[in-house]
Amino acid sequence: MAKGQSLQDPFLNALRRERVPVSIYLVNGIKLQGQVESFDQFVILLKNTVSQMVYKHAISTVVPARPFNVSAHQGTAHGEESDAE
């Protein structure tokens, strides 16, 4: 795992696993809302009434709608489930 990914992956994975609603602000100011369905190195799949593939380089900020625990889910990454935690 690259050093820059060490916080990003557990953060996004916890949002995905707990189905936390998020607001994603793009660098051009547009606000997207939904739940993180999946993600990889370059994109986040955001689900609301439709699924949108959002490129990470276009994202400014990810704002969770409610508190959640990142540290409880640090065993997995990239939107994949893990039974061994």
Curated annotation (Swiss-Prot):
The lineage of its organism: Bacteria, Pseudomonadati, Pseudomonadota, Gammaproteobacteria, Alteromonadales. Residues 9-68 form the Sm domain. Belongs to the Hfq family. Keywords: RNA-binding, Stress response. PANTHER family: RNA-BINDING PROTEIN HFQ. RNA chaperone that binds small regulatory RNA (sRNAs) and mRNAs to facilitate mRNA translational regulation in response to envelope stress, environmental stress and changes in metabolite concentrations. Also binds with high specificity to tRNAs. It comes from the Bacteria. Transmembrane segments: none annotated. GO terms for biological process: regulation of DNA-templated transcription; regulation of RNA stability; regulation of translation, ncRNA-mediated. GO terms for molecular function: RNA binding. InterPro entries: Hfq, LSM_dom_sf, Sm. This is RNA-binding protein Hfq. It comes from Shewanella frigidimarina (strain NCIMB 400). Homohexamer. GO terms for cellular component: cytosol.
